[in-house]
């Protein structure tokens, strides 16, 4: 696919701000995407059709689109149903990312069936699997996802608190050694340039960074926390 050729190697910046965050604005996210492009990003990950629409007006970079939507406190909230797929496809997005964990989806549809339905309805749409474990990655590769992302590693009940860098990047090593047909994208807790660099040194070609670049509240807190540790 053409999009896979366009997004071969480099940094993807996740430009997202939730409703309770001060930068929550499609206009602001479009400018954040522009800043990311000016800094050398080769792609953008964005949440919601409003943000995506504005970002497309500002930059010509490939976009990984998602819709975060909660259904009855279901754990799966990243592009969880066909409704969100339809919205993203109607807007037009290069890659759609969705929760590809083994957790129950809000509509009760199994991931394998969901993937098949998407491919039947939108056969040319590139899809990214957001996974949290090696078994989920193996399953996503078997299904035929174009991309596999480590997005949810550390964010599910079974992986809560884990970091991609734990045990000298052991989880990432296992993924790389699996030699997937799908393109691997490292995402989640890549909070320093050195972590990103390490991923590339290991052979990864695509890394997504979000909060470390685009969430000034959290960035400020880290500075304040370190400053406050100094006793005088």
UniProtKB/Swiss-Prot annotation:
Keyword set, alphabetical order: Carbohydrate metabolism, Isomerase
Domain of life according to the entry: Bacteria
GO molecular function: N-acylglucosamine-6-phosphate 2-epimerase activity
InterPro entries recorded: Aldolase_TIM, NanE, RibuloseP-bd_barrel
Gene3D superfamilies per the UniProt record, alphabetical: Aldolase class I
Biological pathway: Amino-sugar metabolism; N-acetylneuraminate degradation; D-fructose 6-phosphate from N-acetylneuraminate: step 3/5
EC number, as in UniProt: 5.1.3.9
CDD domains: NanE
Catalytic activity: an N-acyl-D-glucosamine 6-phosphate = an N-acyl-D-mannosamine 6-phosphate
First-level EC class: isomerase
GO terms (BP aspect): carbohydrate metabolic process; N-acetylmannosamine catabolic process; N-acetylneuraminate catabolic process
GO cellular component, one term: cytosol
Function according to Swiss-Prot or TrEMBL: Converts N-acetylmannosamine-6-phosphate (ManNAc-6-P) to N-acetylglucosamine-6-phosphate (GlcNAc-6-P).
Family per record: Belongs to the NanE family.
Name of the protein in its database record: Putative N-acetylmannosamine-6-phosphate 2-epimerase
Species lineage: Bacteria, Pseudomonadati, Spirochaetota, Spirochaetia, Spirochaetales
């Amino acid at each position: 696919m053409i999009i896979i050729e366009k997004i071969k190697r480099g940094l993807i910046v996740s430009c997202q701000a939730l409703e309770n965050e001060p930068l929550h604005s499609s206009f602001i996210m479009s400018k954040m995407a522009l800043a990311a492009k000016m800094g050398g990003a080769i792609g953008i990950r964005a949440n919601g059709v409003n943000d995506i629409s504005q970002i497309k007006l500002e930059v010509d970079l490939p976009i990984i689109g998602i819709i975060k939507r909660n259904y009855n406190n279901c754990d799966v909230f990243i592009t969880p149903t066909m409704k969100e797929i339809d919205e993203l496809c109607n807007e037009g997005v290069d890659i759609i990312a969705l929760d590809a964990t083994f957790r129950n989806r809000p509509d009760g549809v199994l991931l394998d069936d969901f993937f098949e339905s998407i491919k039947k309805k939108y056969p040319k749409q590139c899809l990214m699997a957001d996974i949290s474990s090696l078994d989920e990655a193996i399953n996503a590769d078997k299904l035929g996802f174009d991309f596999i992302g480590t997005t949810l590693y550390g964010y599910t009940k079974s992986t809560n608190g884990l970091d991609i860098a734990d045990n000298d990047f052991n989880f990432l090593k296992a993924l790389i050694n699996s030699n997937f047909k799908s393109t691997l994208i490292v995402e989640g807790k890549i909070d320093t340039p050195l972590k990103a660099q390490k991923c590339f040194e290991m052979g990864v070609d695509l890394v997504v960074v979000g909060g470390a670049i685009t969430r000034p509240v959290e960035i400020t807190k880290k500075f304040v926390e370190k400053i406050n540790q100094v006793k005088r």
